[in-house]
Structures are given as C-alpha cells and as structure tokens.
Design a protein with these regions (language model features):
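Extended, non-catalytic substrate-recognition/exosite surfaces adjacent to catalytic cores, especially
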Residues: 51-53, 66, 70, 115-117, ...
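Peptidoglycan glycan-strand catalytic modules in the bacterial/periplasmic cell-wall system
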Residues: 1-150
C-alpha cells in the first residue's frame, strides 16, 4: 500500500504537485459518484460534464489539503480510482489483473497498474499490450530516477512480460462503498472466505453479528 502511494506521488504525469492536484480532484469525483450518491440521479449529477460540477470538485479538492494528510488522500484515492476492466481500487485491480493482493504486487505489476491511471481505456493491457508495456516501463524508469529501484532492477523488470491473467478476473464490487476503508473491507471478506464463507454465500445469506 505504501509502495503504491509512493508510485502515485512520484510518477503521475505532470510532476508531483500537478499530479497531487489531479489525485485530489479524481478522489472527490469518485467519492461523490461511488460512495456519496444514493440513487441514479445523484450518481449522474456526480459525473455530468458541467462547469458547476467541476468548480464544486475543485473547491472540495482544495479543501482536502486542509483536513487530510497527503498520504491519507492518496490512500483514499487508491481505494476508489478506476483501473479499467471494472476494477475500482488498487486491491481489486491487483486481483483483476494478477490474482494477487495489493501488498503482493512486485514492482513491474505495480508499475503496470499505476501506468493504467494515465488512460485506463487506451492502455488496457488486453487490447493494447504494447502500449501498456511501454507505459509500464516508463513508470519503472521513473521509479529508478526517484530512487525506489536501482536502474539494473528497473531494466530487469522492464524486460519481463506483462504477466497478466489470460482474461481479467471479474470481481463483485462489494467494497466500493467502503470508501477509504476498502483495504479493511477486502481483508474482512478474505478472512471470512478462509473460514469457509465464500462471497456468494455472504452476499446471499442473512447473518447476525454478535
């Protein structure tokens, strides 16, 4: 999680400050759309292309820096942002593309996912593997330049295949509305699965928490 946050901070296009501003605005938009909206009308309003909506997002994004640490904003952003193929949040993305948990991502996998944030449709590794690999390798080189990897490691990971699943894993979106608690929500679901309660059973059953 911390590694992914560092990636977002340092390699988003446009530099750290511009990237951080973009993170704030995208987090606000995703929060209003995926968490705060209680019906289709509110969800539509959260994503409409209008100047008032954009100004509201910019104002709310600016206010975030006054109430939350940048690390907390990045964590919340990573828990809600779309990585394409119906994967919202870094945990869902790790499982959708690699069938691993976010904390198990290696640098090449993390770089691929972060690279997708530039254009989740245009850099979809299933429809544009060459573009996705080129972007991944750019991120790896940026990681080396920022000191998160040495250049030899970056070159080694850049020479590796994408390593994605044959087809994206389809996941239920049960943790989207958990917002900034997405990691804990996913942990709870995996814990219950280890105890014999699969997600289908959890979603369809009625349980009493005592």
């Amino acid at each position: 999680q911390g590694f992914a946050r560092a990636l977002v901070t340092n390699v988003l296009a446009g530099g750290v400050e511009q990237g951080a501003s973009t993170v704030n605005q995208q987090y606000v938009k995703n929060y209003l759309w995926l968490v705060d909206a209680e019906n289709e009308e509110e969800a539509s309003a959260a994503t409409e292309q209008s100047i008032p909506r954009k100004l509201r997002e910019m104002r709310m994004a600016s206010d975030l820096d006054k109430t939350l640490e940048k690390d907390e904003i990045l964590t919340r952003y990573l828990n809600l942002v779309s990585f394409g193929n119906h994967a919202f949040g870094i945990e869902a993305a790790a499982r959708t593309y690699f069938d691993v948990s976010a904390h198990e991502l290696n640098p090449a996998q993390a770089a691929l996912l972060v690279g997708l944030l530039q254009s989740v449709e245009g850099l979809n590794p299933y429809t544009n593997p060459e573009g996705a690999m080129q972007r991944r390798n750019t991120v790896l080189n940026n990681m080396a330049a920022e000191g998160y990897l040495d250049q030899a490691e970056a070159d080694r990971f850049a020479g590796a295949p994408l390593g994605i699943l044959d087809k994206p894993r389809t996941l239920p979106q049960g943790c989207i509305t958990a917002g900034d608690k997405g990691f804990m929500c996913d942990y709870a679901l995996r814990y219950l699965a280890d105890k014999g309660l699969d997600l289908d059973t959890i979603q369809s059953g009625s349980y009493t928490i005592t």
